Design a protein with these regions (language model features):
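Ribosome-associated RNA-binding proteins
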Residues: 1-161
Length: 161
């Protein structure tokens, strides 16, 4: 039996990918590393996926964010930026693609999804997997972080409208 290279390397689950592609909606690709979060809007094309817009958590520096780029609030804000960029490009809906990440309740990938949804993109999701507002606004880290999240969100809103 022939096995695809990316499957052998443990990088792609083709069964999940096919299910996402059948929806014919733009995929909201959320990837996390130890330092950053990345949110991309990808469209399927026969010669390879086309990334319509992309956002990485290090962009938050531009809006005055000086905290970690890999925590739950920064994941939410990165999703919010990506959602606003996608709206500017004419994308109004999408479907979440978390790749090989395990879908755990309250995970950072779902915080990014909440940011995309709050930006105005129509995305199907269950409320039970989204982190609580206290975690999204960083109250579990520091009480003053909630005001910083609101401040950054306001700056993003000013830039993207």
């Amino acid at each position: 039996m022939k096995m695809f290279r990316r499957r052998k390397e443990g990088k792609t689950n083709y069964r999940k990918r096919l299910a996402l592609l059948k929806s014919k909606k733009p995929r909201i690709v959320v990837r996390k590393s130890n330092k950053y979060m990345r949110v991309q809007f990808a469209l399927y094309e026969t010669n390879g996926d086309r990334i319509v817009t992309s956002s990485i958590s290090s962009e938050l520096k531009k809006y005055g964010w000086n905290n970690s780029f890999s925590n739950t609030p920064s994941a939410y804000l990165t999703g919010y930026i990506a959602g606003k960029k996608a709206l500017k490009k004419g994308i109004k809906e999408g479907i979440l693609d978390i790749g090989l990440h395990a879908p755990r309740k309250g995970a950072r990938v779902f915080a990014a999804l909440k940011g995309v949804a709050d930006a105005g993109i129509d995305v199907p999701y269950g409320e039970d997997v989204i982190p609580s507002d206290a975690r999204i606004y960083g109250k579990h880290i520091d009480e003053s972080l909630a005001s910083k999240v609101e401040e950054v969100k306001k700056k993003i809103e000013e830039e993207y409208g």
